[in-house]
Amino acid sequence: MLATLQIGIDSKDKNSINYSQGSIFHGLIMEKLESDYVEYLHNLSLNPYSQYVYFDKEKDNFVWQISTVTKEAKENIIDVLVESIGDRIYLKHNEVSYNIKSKSIVGIKTYQEIVDSNFLQKDSDKKNIIGIKLLTPTTYKANGEYQFFPSIQALYCSLYNKWNAFSDKVSLADEEVFKHILEHSLIIKYNLKSYKYCLENVRLNSFIGNFSVLLKGPKELVSICNMLLDYAEYCGLGAKTSMGMGGMKIE
């Protein structure tokens, strides 16, 4: 099961919350969850959730977005936060409080539904060019270093691994499929800037902005790529997605 909790945060100052505070909001989540579940999460190699904060110009407020990719994670994270977060939140690290404007659970889907929405489309409806807007700084690790420019292989690898770890219906555990995905995907344009993301006194290389991916090859492969990029809206893109990085949406 996939689900997203959107929490509207009221702030008169548009600069009062910055990207690097994602780790502070992560700490607030951990404070709200049951201690046994927190320990369980700390022992996982892949997290079944992502979270980040960004400013929504249309709503004119900050949005704290928490997404989960399993039923268990929804019950233990999203459902708990809905009940435990009231009209205000307090960030101990900054010693600041914010009013909560709204809370809503959106985008509830099963894995089968996200598969069907991509594989049962008419060929004319399939996207061969996908625009990706990065809502928060994004990174991945290569050769022991965090990077400041997107790599098709690194970004797909993260999505591919998370899908196979958490999907309860459809497995993509086939090296040939992954190889074909890489061969038939290409970044064709981008408008990005580098960003130093502060995480626990460490400044990570990252990037933020927009880029587009061209999908080639047979229609089944295009469907898989569309499906994985749809999935990225829940699990995040790249590394440190539980710490506020890798927030994205399809344009």
Give short role names for the model-derived ranges.
Residues 1-251:
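RNA-interacting cores
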